[in-house]
Amino acid sequence: MAGSYGAYVLRGDVMNPNYNQTVTLYNCFRAQDNPESRKDIWQRTVLDRCFYKNVMGQVESRDGLKMANAYTVRIPESEKYKPYHEWIKLSPEERAGYFTCSLKDMIVEGECLEEITGATPFTAAELLSRHKPEAFVVTAFSDNTSHLTGKHYRIGG
């Protein structure tokens, strides 16, 4: 089930004008955390008024330097956010009203209507492949909502 939320900065802070992108966040309810299923379950959420940046740069590898994309997404603080350990405790119906962010989740730039079912051609890997380079797997996450201003969730990949 997909949700769509306009993420706003709360408590009267002024909206950052760079937060003008839409992203689709795919949250993975991992099989090891779900006693009712032996497979990952994916939830799609469309988030408006976010910051999205995709930069091509050099990274070191075993074989020397290579070119790779580096992604940064910032989502303004939202009442619809739950930390993963709280999100997984919600019923499926309640979970549909919230989003979370954790490693191995996926982000696609823009509004993506595809669902991840786990069956070909709707696997996470296939969705990622279809939408590259505008899609990535989350490899870094920080909750920056304790800041005095500009409260947000930062996602990297």
Segments (PLM) and residue ranges:
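Polar/acidic, low-complexity leader/linker segments enriched in S/T/G and N/D
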Residues: 2-36
